[in-house]
């Protein structure tokens, strides 16, 4: 349902990331980066670096300065481990072992698999549900919004830049808001389309304001997390209440309830903040991996519910 719905306790983690991390504040790290740039990132040394840099690295946007940061990160980590200290974070992230040009291999692959799961279920929904179903177009729009979010999540975990970070965060917010809209259409909009239209316009206005503030005023990690958590909790509560009220009449709502509970439970994985296993697999990657089957469950619910609504609307048409 919502791509990044997390408990309120995560707010403290998000705020902590905004001010930098222990690793990148270390004088040894900063001095290492400075010396590396002076030695390798200007004049003939820079030309030599570019000539020996693999083409896939340059196409992915890896610069000499980026390579200096990467090498100095591992140099600093090595010193920490030698002295028996805990592995530090750098720029709000744990140190990850780069694979080819992929910055966070496990999270990137998991995001890609989530996207593929969404694509498979989108195709299945499209093949099994006629376009005449009352929820067809709303569900298809939600599927495309989700697919777009997982695309940018894959790009962001492959290469972390200001642009890819913003696109990942903004598209995640769009999924959460669209899930709320989907719930509104299903629970209210089928009987009162004007209410759903007005509510959709309000959500679009909220998303526009959210993106404008983060882009033009201040990219506040704490505020972004707070906004997503607040909307995510509204989303989960709305779906859960509706499912509980209709579970006897609509047995397929049980899948939706399972998704709601799973999302809330799996989000707790984000609290297990630990250095990546084998420098690849951290809690965030495990969370991404664990959400893959959730797409299947939720789209199965959407498919069953859309077919039920189609059957119900057909029966009403015959009665008329």
From Swiss-Prot:
Listed EC numbers: 3.1.1.-
Cytoplasmic face of the membrane: 120-135, 191-198, 245-257, 300-320
Residues that carry a glycan: 40
Keywords, alphabetical: Glycoprotein, Golgi apparatus, GPI-anchor biosynthesis, Hydrolase, Membrane, Signal, Transmembrane, Transmembrane helix
InterPro entries cross-referenced by the UniProt entry: Per1-like
GO molecular function annotation: hydrolase activity, acting on ester bonds
Signal sequence interval, chain numbering: 1-23
EC supergroup of this enzyme: hydrolase
Main localization (coarse): Golgi
Localization terms from the record: Golgi apparatus membrane
Cystine connections: none
Transmembrane regions: 99-119, 136-156, 170-190, 199-219, 224-244, 258-278, 280-299
Superkingdom of origin: Eukaryota
GO cellular component, one term: Golgi membrane
Biological processes per GO annotation: GPI anchor biosynthetic process; GPI anchor metabolic process
Membrane topology: Multi-pass membrane protein
PANTHER family from the UniProt entry: PER1-RELATED (PTHR13148), POST-GPI ATTACHMENT TO PROTEINS FACTOR 3 (PTHR13148:SF0)
Family affiliation: Belongs to the PGAP3 family.
Protein role: Involved in the fatty acid remodeling steps of GPI-anchor maturation where the unsaturated acyl chain at sn-2 of inositol phosphate is replaced by a saturated stearoyl chain. May catalyze the first step of the fatty acid remodeling, by removing the unsaturated acyl chain at sn-2 of inositol phosphate, generating a lyso-GPI intermediate. The fatty acid remodeling steps is critical for the integration of GPI-APs into lipid rafts.
Protein name as it appears in the record: GPI-specific phospholipase A2-like PGAP3
Native organism: Mus musculus (Mouse)
């Amino acid at each position: 349902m919502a791509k990044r719905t997390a408990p309120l306790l995560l707010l403290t983690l998000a705020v902590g990331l905004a001010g930098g991390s222990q690793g990148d504040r270390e004088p040894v790290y900063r001095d290492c980066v400075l010396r590396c740039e002076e030695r390798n990132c200007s004049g003939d040394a820079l030309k030599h670096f570019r000539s020996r840099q693999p083409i896939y690295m340059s196409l992915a946007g890896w610069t000499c300065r980026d390579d200096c940061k990467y090498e100095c990160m591992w140099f600093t980590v090595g010193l920490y481990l030698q002295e028996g200290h805990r592995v530090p974070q750098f720029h709000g992230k744990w140190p990850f072992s780069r694979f080819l040009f992929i910055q966070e291999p496990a999270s990137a692959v998991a995001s890609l698999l989530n996207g593929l799961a969404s694509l498979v279920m989108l195709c299945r929904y499209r093949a099994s549900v006629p376009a005449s179903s009352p929820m067809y177009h709303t569900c298809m729009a939600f599927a495309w919004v989700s697919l777009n979010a997982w695309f940018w999540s894959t790009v962001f975990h492959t290469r972390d830049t200001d642009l890819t970070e913003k696109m990942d965060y903004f598209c995640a917010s769009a999924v959460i808001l669209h899930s709320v809209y989907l719930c509104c259409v299903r629970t209210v909009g089928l009987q009162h389309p004007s209410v759903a239209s007005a509510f959709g316009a309000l959500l679009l206005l909220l998303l526009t304001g959210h993106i404008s503030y983060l882009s033009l005023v201040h990219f506040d990690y704490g505020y972004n997390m707070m906004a997503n958590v607040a909307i995510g909790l509204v989303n989960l509560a709305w779906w859960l209440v509706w499912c509980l009220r209709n579970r006897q009449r609509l047995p397929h709502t049980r899948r939706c309830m399972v998704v709601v509970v799973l999302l809330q439970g799996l989000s707790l994985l984000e609290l297990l903040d630990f250095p990546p296993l084998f420098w690849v697999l951290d809690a965030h990657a495990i969370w991404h991996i664990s959400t893959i089957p959730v797409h299947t469950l939720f789209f199965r619910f959407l498919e069953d519910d859309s077919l039920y609504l189609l059957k119900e609307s057909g029966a009403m048409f015959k009665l008329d």
